[in-house]
């Protein structure tokens, strides 16, 4: 079935704001032949991200803040993280339109009761798509054909650790302990910036970032899209959720640890929690590096269970063709 979809997302400070809609558009075309109009916040950083990633003529990129008032909506629409539609666009929607709102990833139990629920909106049909880890939640946006999945095993044995995180003094101190005691390990810090540095200096394309994760011994990742990429890479990872008030991100982290892994060694749970709250000392690095082979099998087992549920690209497409 051939059709097009309109995808909306505002890029604020989270790479998922731009990577998720673009990965969705790419996957819909490659796997199902669906072309997309992707409406994004266009600024200096998003422009540089777009330049790093090549898209064919079946993915059209538009500035969400400069929408043509005469643009005719497609029947199928996706908003990422409940992006507010331009008023001129929303005014043209009717009961013939299906809007899928792709929500934030969560492993919390409430997701099961809200995934695929319809909004009370009377003008057009709106469905809440909530990605998570349970059977009753949605699958996140990813493709089994992503390049990060096809790196060979030799690359995974490279002594390299990736850090894509919300840097702070505790994390800086943790990395210093690692560097001092394990100088043979290459440390890669992604999106490391401050007031005097250009954030775009170390940007990678989506494919190159996926490959970097697959080639790494351990990955420290942040936010949503990078968590999914780390899961697919198959290497051990430590996740740092987006930091929220009242330690709500710790509740989100605990829910993920409880439901994603079949059984979690207490030392590993402690490392996850410390990474989001405090930092790691020599004892924690010794545990991770000293048990790396056992941890690899542990993470691969969890990944294989995770991807058996299907992909968000396939599930969203299925909703469109119902």
What are these regions (language model features)?
Residues 2-6:
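Extreme N-terminal starter segment of soluble prokaryotic enzymes
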Residues 7-33, 39-123:
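Active-site and donor-binding regions of nucleotide-sugar-utilizing enzymes
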Residues 14-15, 22, 204-252:
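A donor-sugar binding/catalytic signature common to diverse glycosyltransferases
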Residues 19, 168-176:
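A conserved mid-protein helix/loop that constitutes part of the nucleotide-sugar donor-binding site
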Residues 103-171:
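A nucleotide-sugar donor-handling region in carbohydrate enzymes
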Residues 178-202:
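Catalytic donor nucleotide-activated moiety binding site of glycosyltransferases and closely related
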Residues 236-279:
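Nucleotide-sugar donor-binding patch of glycosyltransferase catalytic domains
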Residues 262-322:
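C-terminal amphipathic helix plus adjacent low-complexity
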């Amino acid at each position: 079935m051939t059709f097009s979809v309109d995808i909306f997302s505002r890029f604020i400070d989270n790479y998922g704001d731009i990577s998720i809609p673009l990965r969705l558009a790419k996957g819909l075309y490659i796997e199902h032949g669906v072309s997309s109009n992707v409406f994004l916040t266009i600024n200096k950083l998003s422009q540089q991200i777009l330049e790093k990633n090549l898209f064919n003529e079946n993915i059209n990129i538009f500035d969400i803040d400069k929408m043509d008032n005469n643009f005719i909506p497609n029947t199928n629409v996706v908003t990422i993280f409940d992006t507010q539609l331009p008023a001129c666009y929303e005014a043209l929607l009717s009961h013939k339109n299906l809007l899928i709102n792709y929500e934030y990833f969560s492993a919390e139990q409430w997701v099961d009761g809200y995934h695929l629920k319809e909004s009370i909106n009377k003008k057009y049909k709106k469905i809440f798509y909530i990605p998570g880890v349970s059977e009753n939640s949605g699958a996140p946006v990813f493709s089994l054909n992503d390049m990060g999945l096809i790196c060979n095993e030799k690359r995974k044995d490279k002594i390299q650790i990736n850090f894509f995180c919300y840097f702070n003094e505790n994390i800086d101190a943790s990395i210093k302990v690692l560097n001092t005691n394990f100088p043979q390990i290459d440390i890669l810090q992604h999106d490391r910036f401050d007031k005097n540095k250009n954030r775009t200096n170390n940007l990678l394309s989506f494919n190159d970032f996926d490959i970097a994760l697959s080639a790494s011994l351990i990955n420290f990742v942040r936010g949503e899209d990078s968590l999914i990429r780390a899961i697919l890479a198959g290497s051990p990872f430590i996740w740092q959720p987006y930091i929220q008030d009242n330690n709500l991100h710790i509740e989100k982290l605990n829910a993920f640890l409880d439901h994603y892994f079949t059984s979690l060694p207490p030392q590993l749970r402690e490392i996850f929690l410390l990474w989001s709250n405090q930092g790691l000392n020599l004892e924690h690095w010794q545990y991770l590096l000293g048990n790396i082979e056992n941890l690899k099998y542990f993470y691969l087992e969890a990944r294989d269970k995770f991807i058996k549920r299907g992909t968000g690209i396939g599930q969203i497409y299925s909703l469109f063709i119902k």
